[in-house]
A protein has these predicted regions:
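Histidine-centered divalent metal-coordination motifs
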Residues: 22, 29-36, 153-155, 175-176, ...
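Metal-associated gating/positioning segment near the N- to mid-region
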Residues: 22-82, 98-102, 110, 136, ...
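Alpha-helix-loop-beta-strand connector modules within alpha/beta enzyme cores
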Residues: 76-94, 138-157, 195-200
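Histidine-rich, glycine-flanked metal-binding segment
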Residues: 1-25
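Active-site-adjacent beta->alpha loops and helix N-cap segments on the catalytic face
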Residues: 68-74, 131-146, 182-193
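Active-site neighborhoods of metal-dependent hydrolases
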Residues: 115-133, 179-293, 298
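Divalent metal-dependent hydrolysis catalytic cores, especially in the metallo-beta-lactamase
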Residues: 49-69, 85-95, 120-132, 151, ...
Length: 315
Protein backbone atom coordinates (compact mmCIF):
# COMPACT_ATOMS: atom_id res chain seq x y z
CA UNK A 1 0.00 0.00 0.00
CA UNK A 2 1.00 3.60 -0.44
CA UNK A 3 -0.44 6.82 0.92
CA UNK A 4 0.05 9.71 3.36
CA UNK A 5 1.77 9.18 6.69
CA UNK A 6 -0.74 8.03 9.28
CA UNK A 7 -3.12 6.55 6.74
CA UNK A 8 -1.07 3.51 5.73
CA UNK A 9 -0.64 0.44 7.91
CA UNK A 10 3.07 -0.12 8.59
CA UNK A 11 4.17 -3.51 10.00
CA UNK A 12 5.82 -3.29 13.41
CA UNK A 13 9.04 -4.91 12.16
CA UNK A 14 9.38 -2.58 9.17
CA UNK A 15 12.49 -0.43 8.82
CA UNK A 16 11.36 3.16 8.37
CA UNK A 17 13.58 5.59 6.47
CA UNK A 18 13.17 9.37 6.87
CA UNK A 19 13.00 10.62 3.27
CA UNK A 20 11.77 14.19 3.71
CA UNK A 21 13.23 16.36 0.97
CA UNK A 22 14.68 13.40 -0.91
CA UNK A 23 13.90 11.89 -4.30
CA UNK A 24 12.85 8.25 -4.58
CA UNK A 25 13.56 6.80 -8.02
CA UNK A 26 14.26 3.46 -9.69
CA UNK A 27 17.81 2.18 -9.96
CA UNK A 28 19.74 3.52 -12.93
CA UNK A 29 20.24 1.33 -16.00
CA UNK A 30 23.58 1.79 -17.75
CA UNK A 31 23.25 0.24 -21.20
CA UNK A 32 26.90 0.72 -22.20
CA UNK A 33 28.91 -0.13 -19.09
CA UNK A 34 32.38 -1.56 -19.57
CA UNK A 35 34.18 -2.97 -16.56
CA UNK A 36 36.55 -5.81 -15.79
CA UNK A 37 34.94 -8.81 -14.11
CA UNK A 38 37.94 -11.11 -13.70
CA UNK A 39 41.73 -11.17 -13.64
CA UNK A 40 43.56 -14.17 -15.12
CA UNK A 41 40.31 -16.09 -15.02
CA UNK A 42 39.61 -15.41 -11.34
CA UNK A 43 36.41 -13.57 -10.41
CA UNK A 44 36.86 -11.50 -7.23
CA UNK A 45 34.37 -11.97 -4.42
CA UNK A 46 34.36 -8.19 -4.02
CA UNK A 47 34.74 -6.27 -7.27
CA UNK A 48 35.25 -2.53 -6.81
CA UNK A 49 33.75 -1.93 -10.27
CA UNK A 50 30.43 -3.39 -9.15
CA UNK A 51 30.55 -1.76 -5.73
CA UNK A 52 31.18 1.65 -7.32
CA UNK A 53 28.19 1.20 -9.60
CA UNK A 54 25.87 0.18 -6.77
CA UNK A 55 27.23 3.01 -4.63
CA UNK A 56 25.91 5.46 -7.21
CA UNK A 57 22.55 3.77 -7.69
CA UNK A 58 23.33 1.85 -10.89
CA UNK A 59 21.44 -1.41 -10.41
CA UNK A 60 21.44 -2.81 -13.97
CA UNK A 61 24.27 -2.81 -16.51
CA UNK A 62 24.70 -4.01 -20.07
CA UNK A 63 28.29 -4.36 -21.26
CA UNK A 64 28.53 -4.43 -25.07
CA UNK A 65 32.11 -5.74 -25.08
CA UNK A 66 33.64 -7.97 -22.46
CA UNK A 67 35.42 -11.26 -22.02
CA UNK A 68 32.83 -13.97 -22.63
CA UNK A 69 34.03 -16.37 -19.95
CA UNK A 70 34.28 -13.86 -17.12
CA UNK A 71 31.23 -11.65 -17.73
CA UNK A 72 28.69 -14.47 -17.93
CA UNK A 73 30.23 -16.32 -14.99
CA UNK A 74 30.03 -13.12 -12.92
CA UNK A 75 26.45 -12.58 -14.05
CA UNK A 76 25.43 -16.07 -12.94
CA UNK A 77 27.23 -15.66 -9.62
CA UNK A 78 25.30 -12.43 -9.06
CA UNK A 79 21.99 -14.17 -9.78
CA UNK A 80 22.95 -16.93 -7.33
CA UNK A 81 23.76 -14.42 -4.61
CA UNK A 82 27.43 -15.41 -4.48
CA UNK A 83 28.72 -11.91 -5.27
CA UNK A 84 27.26 -8.43 -4.86
CA UNK A 85 26.80 -6.59 -8.14
CA UNK A 86 24.19 -4.90 -10.32
CA UNK A 87 22.11 -7.12 -12.57
CA UNK A 88 24.71 -7.79 -15.25
CA UNK A 89 24.06 -8.45 -18.93
CA UNK A 90 26.47 -8.46 -21.83
CA UNK A 91 27.14 -9.26 -25.45
CA UNK A 92 30.30 -11.06 -24.40
CA UNK A 93 33.11 -10.91 -26.93
CA UNK A 94 32.30 -8.62 -29.84
CA UNK A 95 31.66 -9.96 -33.34
CA UNK A 96 34.75 -8.23 -34.69
CA UNK A 97 34.94 -7.64 -38.42
CA UNK A 98 38.57 -6.56 -38.81
CA UNK A 99 41.67 -8.74 -38.85
CA UNK A 100 42.75 -10.03 -35.47
CA UNK A 101 42.97 -13.02 -33.20
CA UNK A 102 39.23 -12.98 -32.46
CA UNK A 103 37.83 -11.92 -35.83
CA UNK A 104 34.30 -13.23 -36.45
CA UNK A 105 34.21 -14.37 -40.07
CA UNK A 106 30.76 -13.66 -41.51
CA UNK A 107 30.21 -14.23 -45.23
CA UNK A 108 26.79 -15.85 -45.15
CA UNK A 109 23.66 -16.19 -43.05
CA UNK A 110 24.95 -19.57 -41.87
CA UNK A 111 28.09 -17.87 -40.54
CA UNK A 112 26.01 -15.30 -38.68
CA UNK A 113 23.75 -17.97 -37.19
CA UNK A 114 26.79 -19.92 -36.00
CA UNK A 115 28.22 -16.93 -34.13
CA UNK A 116 24.90 -15.93 -32.58
CA UNK A 117 24.12 -19.49 -31.52
CA UNK A 118 27.43 -19.82 -29.69
CA UNK A 119 26.92 -16.47 -27.92
CA UNK A 120 23.34 -17.28 -26.95
CA UNK A 121 24.49 -20.63 -25.58
CA UNK A 122 26.73 -18.94 -23.01
CA UNK A 123 24.07 -16.49 -21.84
CA UNK A 124 23.96 -13.54 -24.25
CA UNK A 125 20.64 -12.06 -25.37
CA UNK A 126 22.51 -9.44 -27.41
CA UNK A 127 25.53 -9.30 -29.69
CA UNK A 128 27.75 -6.43 -30.73
CA UNK A 129 28.26 -6.17 -34.46
CA UNK A 130 31.64 -4.45 -34.39
CA UNK A 131 33.03 -2.90 -37.57
CA UNK A 132 31.78 -5.59 -39.91
CA UNK A 133 32.92 -3.79 -43.07
CA UNK A 134 30.19 -4.77 -45.54
CA UNK A 135 26.53 -3.93 -45.20
CA UNK A 136 25.44 -7.43 -46.21
CA UNK A 137 27.50 -8.85 -43.32
CA UNK A 138 25.72 -6.56 -40.88
CA UNK A 139 22.37 -7.50 -42.40
CA UNK A 140 23.13 -11.21 -42.00
CA UNK A 141 23.76 -10.66 -38.29
CA UNK A 142 20.45 -8.80 -37.97
CA UNK A 143 18.50 -11.53 -39.76
CA UNK A 144 20.05 -14.24 -37.58
CA UNK A 145 19.27 -12.19 -34.47
CA UNK A 146 15.63 -11.77 -35.45
CA UNK A 147 15.30 -15.52 -35.93
CA UNK A 148 16.79 -16.15 -32.48
CA UNK A 149 15.10 -13.29 -30.61
CA UNK A 150 18.36 -11.47 -29.89
CA UNK A 151 19.38 -7.80 -29.91
CA UNK A 152 22.11 -6.32 -32.13
CA UNK A 153 23.96 -3.26 -30.85
CA UNK A 154 26.54 -2.12 -33.42
CA UNK A 155 29.68 -0.12 -32.85
CA UNK A 156 28.95 3.30 -34.31
CA UNK A 157 32.47 3.47 -35.69
CA UNK A 158 32.46 7.25 -36.28
CA UNK A 159 31.26 6.69 -39.85
CA UNK A 160 28.02 8.51 -40.58
CA UNK A 161 27.04 6.62 -43.74
CA UNK A 162 27.43 3.36 -41.81
CA UNK A 163 25.25 4.77 -39.02
CA UNK A 164 22.47 5.60 -41.48
CA UNK A 165 22.49 2.09 -42.97
CA UNK A 166 22.49 0.66 -39.43
CA UNK A 167 19.32 2.64 -38.75
CA UNK A 168 17.66 1.64 -42.03
CA UNK A 169 18.53 -2.04 -41.56
CA UNK A 170 16.90 -2.14 -38.12
CA UNK A 171 19.65 -2.56 -35.55
CA UNK A 172 18.47 -2.37 -31.95
CA UNK A 173 20.36 0.89 -31.54
CA UNK A 174 23.45 2.92 -32.32
CA UNK A 175 26.25 2.80 -29.76
CA UNK A 176 28.49 5.90 -29.51
CA UNK A 177 27.82 9.32 -30.97
CA UNK A 178 27.16 9.94 -34.62
CA UNK A 179 30.24 11.78 -35.96
CA UNK A 180 28.46 14.98 -36.99
CA UNK A 181 27.72 18.17 -35.09
CA UNK A 182 24.06 18.40 -36.06
CA UNK A 183 21.32 16.30 -37.61
CA UNK A 184 18.26 17.69 -39.34
CA UNK A 185 14.68 16.72 -40.07
CA UNK A 186 15.48 14.09 -42.69
CA UNK A 187 17.66 12.05 -40.34
CA UNK A 188 15.33 12.64 -37.39
CA UNK A 189 12.35 11.36 -39.38
CA UNK A 190 14.33 8.33 -40.54
CA UNK A 191 15.57 7.53 -37.04
CA UNK A 192 12.18 7.91 -35.39
CA UNK A 193 10.44 5.86 -38.06
CA UNK A 194 12.92 3.00 -37.70
CA UNK A 195 12.42 2.82 -33.90
CA UNK A 196 16.18 2.42 -33.40
CA UNK A 197 17.62 3.46 -30.03
CA UNK A 198 20.62 5.70 -29.34
CA UNK A 199 23.25 5.23 -26.64
CA UNK A 200 25.63 8.15 -27.34
CA UNK A 201 28.22 7.54 -24.57
CA UNK A 202 28.80 11.29 -24.33
CA UNK A 203 31.69 10.75 -21.93
CA UNK A 204 33.74 9.66 -24.96
CA UNK A 205 31.91 11.63 -27.67
CA UNK A 206 33.47 11.49 -31.12
CA UNK A 207 34.81 14.61 -32.82
CA UNK A 208 36.34 16.51 -29.91
CA UNK A 209 36.56 16.70 -26.14
CA UNK A 210 34.04 14.43 -24.43
CA UNK A 211 31.99 14.68 -21.29
CA UNK A 212 34.50 12.88 -19.09
CA UNK A 213 37.07 15.60 -19.77
CA UNK A 214 34.50 18.29 -18.93
CA UNK A 215 33.43 16.84 -15.59
CA UNK A 216 37.03 16.37 -14.49
CA UNK A 217 37.65 19.97 -15.55
CA UNK A 218 34.79 21.63 -13.64
CA UNK A 219 34.51 19.33 -10.61
CA UNK A 220 37.04 18.32 -7.97
CA UNK A 221 36.19 14.66 -8.41
CA UNK A 222 38.89 13.46 -6.00
CA UNK A 223 37.08 15.30 -3.17
CA UNK A 224 33.94 13.23 -3.67
CA UNK A 225 33.90 10.85 -0.71
CA UNK A 226 31.72 8.30 -2.47
CA UNK A 227 33.96 8.21 -5.54
CA UNK A 228 37.03 7.67 -3.39
CA UNK A 229 35.31 5.08 -1.19
CA UNK A 230 34.69 2.70 -4.08
CA UNK A 231 37.27 3.51 -6.77
CA UNK A 232 40.99 2.75 -6.28
CA UNK A 233 43.01 5.99 -5.95
CA UNK A 234 45.16 5.15 -8.98
CA UNK A 235 41.99 5.11 -11.09
CA UNK A 236 40.97 8.58 -9.94
CA UNK A 237 43.94 10.74 -8.97
CA UNK A 238 45.86 11.05 -12.27
CA UNK A 239 42.84 12.30 -14.22
CA UNK A 240 41.09 14.13 -11.39
CA UNK A 241 43.85 16.07 -9.63
CA UNK A 242 46.12 16.74 -12.62
CA UNK A 243 43.31 17.47 -15.03
CA UNK A 244 43.42 19.48 -18.22
CA UNK A 245 41.12 22.42 -18.90
CA UNK A 246 39.56 23.99 -21.97
CA UNK A 247 37.06 26.73 -22.87
CA UNK A 248 33.44 25.61 -22.69
CA UNK A 249 33.02 25.96 -26.45
CA UNK A 250 35.70 23.29 -27.00
CA UNK A 251 33.60 20.60 -25.33
CA UNK A 252 32.06 18.70 -28.20
CA UNK A 253 29.84 16.49 -26.03
CA UNK A 254 27.46 19.41 -25.46
CA UNK A 255 26.79 19.73 -29.18
CA UNK A 256 26.34 15.97 -29.37
CA UNK A 257 23.92 16.10 -26.44
CA UNK A 258 21.71 18.52 -28.38
CA UNK A 259 21.13 15.73 -30.89
CA UNK A 260 19.79 13.49 -28.11
CA UNK A 261 17.32 16.21 -27.12
CA UNK A 262 16.12 16.48 -30.72
CA UNK A 263 15.61 12.71 -30.83
CA UNK A 264 13.53 12.44 -27.66
CA UNK A 265 11.45 15.45 -28.72
CA UNK A 266 10.58 13.43 -31.85
CA UNK A 267 9.63 10.40 -29.75
CA UNK A 268 12.98 8.65 -30.08
CA UNK A 269 14.64 6.37 -27.54
CA UNK A 270 17.86 7.61 -25.91
CA UNK A 271 19.63 5.59 -23.20
CA UNK A 272 22.40 6.37 -20.72
CA UNK A 273 25.75 4.66 -21.22
CA UNK A 274 28.66 5.80 -19.06
CA UNK A 275 31.18 3.65 -20.97
CA UNK A 276 32.81 2.62 -17.68
CA UNK A 277 35.03 5.70 -17.66
CA UNK A 278 34.88 6.08 -13.88
CA UNK A 279 32.43 3.49 -12.70
CA UNK A 280 29.46 4.73 -10.74
CA UNK A 281 29.70 8.45 -11.25
CA UNK A 282 30.21 8.15 -15.01
CA UNK A 283 26.56 7.17 -15.44
CA UNK A 284 25.58 10.39 -13.68
CA UNK A 285 28.01 12.34 -15.87
CA UNK A 286 26.06 11.01 -18.84
CA UNK A 287 22.77 12.21 -17.37
CA UNK A 288 24.22 15.63 -16.55
CA UNK A 289 25.55 15.87 -20.10
CA UNK A 290 22.06 15.16 -21.45
CA UNK A 291 20.83 18.18 -19.50
CA UNK A 292 23.64 20.31 -20.94
CA UNK A 293 22.21 19.46 -24.37
CA UNK A 294 18.73 20.66 -23.46
CA UNK A 295 17.00 17.73 -21.77
CA UNK A 296 15.07 18.49 -18.62
CA UNK A 297 16.22 16.66 -15.48
CA UNK A 298 13.11 14.47 -15.77
CA UNK A 299 13.94 13.57 -19.38
CA UNK A 300 17.51 12.71 -18.41
CA UNK A 301 16.34 10.47 -15.56
CA UNK A 302 13.87 8.80 -17.93
CA UNK A 303 16.74 8.05 -20.32
CA UNK A 304 18.68 6.54 -17.43
CA UNK A 305 15.82 4.31 -16.29
CA UNK A 306 12.74 3.62 -18.45
CA UNK A 307 14.46 4.09 -21.82
CA UNK A 308 17.22 1.68 -20.82
CA UNK A 309 14.67 -0.94 -19.79
CA UNK A 310 12.85 -0.58 -23.11
CA UNK A 311 16.09 -0.76 -25.07
CA UNK A 312 17.08 -4.03 -23.41
CA UNK A 313 13.61 -5.52 -23.86
CA UNK A 314 12.83 -5.53 -20.15
CA UNK A 315 9.77 -3.27 -20.27
Amino acid sequence: DSGPDGKVSIPENAHVLPLEGRLVMPGLIDTHAHGQQAASGFIPQQNWVDYARLGFGVTTVHDPSNDTQSIFAASEMTKAGLITAPRTFSTGRILYGAAGSYKAEIDSLDDAEFHLERMKAVGAFSVKSYNQPRRDQRQQIIKAAREMGMLVVPEGGATFMHNLTMIVDGHTGIEHTVPVEMIYGDVLDLWRGAAVGYTPTLNVAYGGLGGENYWYDVDEVWRNDRVMAFNPPHKVIPRARRRTTAPIEDYNHIRQARITKKLIDQGGLVQAGGHGQLNGICTHWELWSFVQGGMTPFEALRSGTLHGAKYLGMY
